Amino acid sequence: MAYWNYNPEIAARKKKNADIFRETTKLIQAGGYITPSGKQIRFDFTRMLQQGKCFQQEIPIVSSPSVEGGTKVMVESNDCLVAAERLVKEGYNPVLLNFASAGHPGGGVETGARAQEETICRRSTLTRSIYSFDAKYASRYGYALQAGEHYPIVSEFSAVYSPAVTVFREGIDCLFMEEPYDVAVVTCAALNLNGKYPIKLTPDGHMPQAAIDITRNKIRTVFRIGLTYGHDSLVLGAFGCGAFKNPPAEIAKLFHEVMEEPEFKNKYRLITFSIIEDHNSNNRNLRAFEAEFGVAPKRAKLPAPDNITSLQPNQIFVFGSVCKV
């Protein structure tokens, strides 16, 4: 007989995460929120909905001028949303890579999962975009289904571009930000090599050639989308190196190889790999990227990944009325 190993601490954490996301959804549907100081923030979805796009076919090669001084590469132990905020404040126009679930926009955010995609969805308006590219989710949340291609995003050229995503929750406790910021997001699914799908790791734990070829095209797709829409910087990370079991050293090498291709070499002002080690990574990801790019990682002082305490009595506004959530 099989037993389910119930952990009340994990269950409580997942419930809290799910509660936070439900609140985030209410705020998105309400159109904004009230900051702790009482300032009213309104979301503007115009650009997101007008310029957002789901890609399923190979994007044509992009011809872009090289940047003066070449591309600066960083590896940092940091929250990807904090890294994106820093770049925005420094005057960059970044695009952030969201490590997607191929079949379910937002992954397990509704049930409190805590991987990178779910974290982004809890803390921003991203689901307002990606849910509108899936008929089931668009219907569930009352959003109009976007024209064109839709989920699932399973091919080597599949991705969703979401401009002007508003990040409005802090990393610690997901509290409301006094000064939210907008950032573009590319949602792309890494290849799942955890053994449950046809393409698997080799017996000695390496990526087979089929996985290498597919992943290289996924990376090219992300880079091309960024250049197509005029972005000058990328916030990347250990793509697929958690639960999907992609070897971090090989993923880092693939990123490096694509960056050196003539189409992409020195076309971005800055590329940063923002990496947080978690229960899936066994502390290998940051070291692998540091070794590949030969740079010492910038280490931010981060809270424990599970440091999510009780929600504050935040407020939302609905058509001008202030309400408690």
Please tell me what each predicted stretch does:
Residues M1-L234, A238-V325:
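Macrodomain-like recognition of ADP-ribose-binding/processing modules
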